[in-house]
Design a protein with these regions (language model features):
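Alpha-helical transmembrane segments of multi-pass membrane proteins
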Residues: 42, 46, 57-81, 95-99
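Interfacial/gating helices of multi-pass transporter permease domains
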Residues: 25, 60-62, 119-124, 162-174, ...
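Alpha-helical transmembrane segments of multi-pass membrane transport and lipid-handling proteins
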Residues: 27-56, 67, 111
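Helix-loop interface residues and adjacent transmembrane-helix termini in multi-pass membrane transporters
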Residues: 58, 87-88, 115-116, 183, ...
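Small-residue-rich midsections of specific transmembrane alpha-helices
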Residues: 1-15, 30-37, 72-80, 175-187, ...
């Protein structure tokens, strides 16, 4: 959730035309997000086998967990990049990227379904979409940021962030809150898989998807 930090601190700095501070905040956010993403994937690697055995109850899917988990690496700067596009008013670029991601995923999965390619191809389609979004977001950030922050903005020293403790505290609290919400709200399918079967988890996931469509305003 580093996007909130970028919007609050870098966006505020840009509003005051303090480009060096905005650049330093974005650099701080990108470094922090990159490090935590690498740590997250390392934790995933360590827990993948346990998840396959006790939640999915099929050790053979460990490789699928590891491969699909590469989306963490592909999106390691996505939060920061998305926030930079927002504070620099490049919403149209975001919309086009999202559309391209969704179309690519839908076409890939559609082909996999028609050719009966199996679970691996379907996961590859989802992974491709996530990679397009993550890498595309960073590419757009690097393309548009110089106009708002100046050329060579990434070389800005972090020493200018005298309130780095405040930034770190904000990042920690927002990410902790997001993690708690995710564990409570988004882990239902995992608990179903743990206590029941993977088929039950699949049915529950499908039911949630249908319910979300029905409840859409």
């Amino acid at each position: 959730r580093m996007g909130e930090l970028v919007v609050k601190y870098a966006g505020g700095a840009l509003a005051l035309n303090d480009k060096p501070r905005a650049a330093a905040v974005i650099k701080f956010a990108a470094i922090t997000e990159g490090i935590t993403s690498l740590l997250a994937y390392a934790i995933l690697v360590g827990l993948a086998d346990l998840a396959a055995r006790f939640i999915i109850k099929d050790p053979s899917v460990t490789v699928y967990i590891l491969v699909y988990g590469l989306m963490i690496i592909g999106n390691m700067l996505a939060e920061t990049g998305t926030a930079v596009l927002q504070i620099t008013n490049h919403f149209r670029s975001q919309a086009i990227l999202n559309l391209f991601q969704n179309v690519t995923t839908a076409v890939w999965i559609g082909i996999a379904f028609l050719t009966k390619s199996g679970l691996g191809s379907i996961l590859a389609g989802y992974l491709m979409g996530k990679m397009i979004f993550g890498i595309g977001t960073v590419a757009l950030m690097l393309a548009h940021a110089p106009a708002a922050l100046g050329k060579g903005w990434w070389r800005t020293s972090l020493k200018g962030l005298s309130d780095w403790r405040s930034l770190a505290q904000f990042a920690f609290t927002t990410n902790l809150s997001g993690t708690i919400n995710m564990v409570i709200r988004d882990s239902e399918v995992l608990w179903v898989g743990f206590f029941l079967t993977k088929a039950d988890a699949g049915y529950y996931k499908f039911a949630l998807a249908i319910m979300n469509i029905i409840l859409m305003p």
